[in-house]
Amino acid sequence: MPRALWPAWVWAIIILSMEGASDKASSLSCDPTGVCDGRSRSLNSIPSGLTAGVKSLDLSNNEITYVGNRDLQRCVNLKTLRLGANEIHTVEEDSFFHLRNLEYLDLSYNRLSNLSSSWFRSLYVLKFLNLLGNLYKTLGETSLFSHLPDLRTLKVGNSNSFTEIHEKDFTGLTFLEELEISAQNLQIYVPKSLKSIQNISHLILHLKQPVLLVDILVDIVSSLDCLELRDTNLHTFHFSEASISEMSTSVKKLIFRNVQFTDESFVEVVKLFNYVSGIVEVEFDDCTHDGIGDFRALSLDRIRHLGNVETLTIRKLHIPQFFLFQDLSSIYPLTGKVKRVTIENSKVFLVPCLLSQHLKSLEYLDLSENLMSEETLKNSACKDAWPFLQTLVLRQNRLKSLEKTGELLLTLKNLNNLDISKNNFLSMPETCQWPGKMKQLNLSSTKIRSLTQCLPQTLEILDVSNNNLDSFSLILPQLKELYISRNKLKTLPDASFLPVLSVMGISKNIINTFSKEQLDSFQQLKTLEAGGNNFICSCDFLSFTQGQQALGRVLVDWPDDYRCDSPSHVRGQRLQDARLSLSECHRAAVVSAACCALFLFLLLTGVLCHRFHGLWYMKIMWAWLQAKRKPRKAPRRDICYDAFVSYSERDSYWVENLMVQELEHFNPPFKLCLHKRDFIPGKWIIDNIIDSIEKSHKTIFVLSENFVKSEWCKYELDFSHFRLFDENNDAVILILLEPIDKKAIPQRFCKLRKIMNTKTYLEWPLDETQQEGFWLNLRAAIRS
């Protein structure tokens, strides 16, 4: 390789290594508490750089194949490690040696073909271990869990290759809360293999065939609380009385999940109930009965009862030969001690009257998600049926008439709790009949639009959630709990109708607000759920909700579910956090203050205008604007006068008898414009002044004390003032008729005062010998 290429190769290797390190670093997202998430990142190894700060590490659903001794050695504070759903086939002996604080370890669904006890020898505080779904055939040659004294949950086995359970496998385990064994292909079970475990709260067995089931039961029946059998075909199951009859049993509950029965194997299971006397609860979930219910030929009549079974639960029972199934009359006598029955989502459309009458101890019956209607309910709730029944659940069946349903249940004298939710009642009649002891009624999701006096007055708990109600105005004097969420209510119900109400759920309606007075009116209210409404966050409402510290103890969903819908600028904010401006909360005060401020402003403006002649400035501005709309200077042909004379009426004698005589009778004569004779009648005075000044070659101001005091003289002087300084000409002639103090001229005529200070003006002489010279100078000024 040429020497010149070596630097390029070195840089490429460095860059690739940096990118690899960057990818590793970015493969995990860790929060400040040390919880790191690396799920589904396509990782093929455990990320490097893990430190003692990591307390929880989730690397499930990746492509990791190998766990080395050094991969986790710095994670000394790790408590949770999830490595499930990877491709791990090798775990080195000391991979978990430094994880002495580990409490949760998941190695499920990998490719481990061998298990080693050395993996767990330092995990003294481990509580949860999942080894399901790997490839091992056995649990190893030595005791795998002997170093795990605190282990409480253990999951082992797989669905294919796990075939053997030996006596040593569970040595060292004395108490387990949950043990799950997946052994669909189990071929060898050495007796007493599970007997070493002194107590198991819940055992889950995945067995495909029941061949070894009885052997396992013999070992655990005295140490087990709950047995759950999954994915098992019990077609060939046969129960041997001799194997269990003389042993003390502790099993209290049996669960069959996804299990297949025949008529024969069902009878064998019923026998088991009799001999395992501690069983009080039996559950069938998603099971299949491959039979027609013909138990008479199977000696079922020899069995007098179901042992001590009090609770029977059946969910999603499949009967392929449903239309050939018999009436089950042979099992009626076995049901006398049963107190609680749940048959859910199993296509039940009828409980025969005779069976109902045999259920003499029944207190709770749940027939949810079935096909019960009023016609079949009439037969089921016949006379003497379910004499001690207290709770009946008929949720999501085919009931349509509320009136008829209540009437059919009158035979149930002890019924106090009825759930008929998710039926299509649509409406509620005005009156109904109900059992006399009714205290709880669930009518949620029944599409009713209004409530009537049909409801029993004895109710203590009522649920009418998720309907189309827009009001609640019923008087229920004994009602303690009301659930009316997901309706269309605009306000809280009237407290006088519900005097003893202590719990109310009214969330997700269209309530805009509620007040302290409303809440206080419910004198016994302890719990209110009102979140999810469209609250208008007014100042009063926010002040109430934010100022009541005790409100959080009443509102169970406070504060997260209480959010503003309006005003728009606080929409989505929690009531606790929303803030409104001062103007929104104290509008009257703000308007009053604004009015006062406006009044003071106008008053101050008036004073300032009076003091600094503001009105005059406005008038002169208007006159100036009017003048600006006309040509700046009239064409020469429009000049009609030699001079416009502005004077005070009190100086008219001097103007008319002296000035006019001297100028208009001179040869050649001057043509003067005087307001008395030349203003156009009917025309605005201000327009006359403007036109006269513009049509005059000069403007003569006869100044005197009277002139300064004259309002119209001021207007004439005002416009001339603008003309003088806007057109920048010398069209103004000042005649001082009598001596006046320059200070008497208003300050606003600053330009005029400046002219008087800088230019010569004509002063009328009192000496007659000098008057001829005055007229001579005036005529010369006009001609200039």
From Swiss-Prot:
Protein name per the record: Toll-like receptor 2
Keywords, comma-separated and alphabetical: Cytoplasmic vesicle, Disulfide bond, Glycoprotein, Immunity, Inflammatory response, Innate immunity, Isopeptide bond, Leucine-rich repeat, Membrane, NAD, Receptor, Repeat, Signal, Transmembrane, Transmembrane helix, Ubl conjugation
Single GO term (MF): NAD+ nucleosidase activity, cyclic ADP-ribose generating
Site (Interaction with bacterial lipopeptide): 349
Organism: Boselaphus tragocamelus
Chain residue numbers at which the record places covalent cross-link Glycyl lysine isopeptide (Lys-Gly) (interchain with G-Cter in ubiquitin): 754
Gene: TLR2
Membrane-spanning segments: 588-608
Keyword 4Fe-4S: no
Assembly and interaction partners: Interacts with LY96, TLR1 and TLR6 (via extracellular domain). TLR2 seems to exist in heterodimers with either TLR1 or TLR6 before stimulation by the ligand. The heterodimers form bigger oligomers in response to their corresponding ligands as well as further heterotypic associations with other receptors such as CD14 and/or CD36. Binds MYD88 (via TIR domain). Interacts with TICAM1. Interacts with CNPY3. Interacts with ATG16L1. Interacts with PPP1R11. Interacts with TICAM2. Interacts with TIRAP.
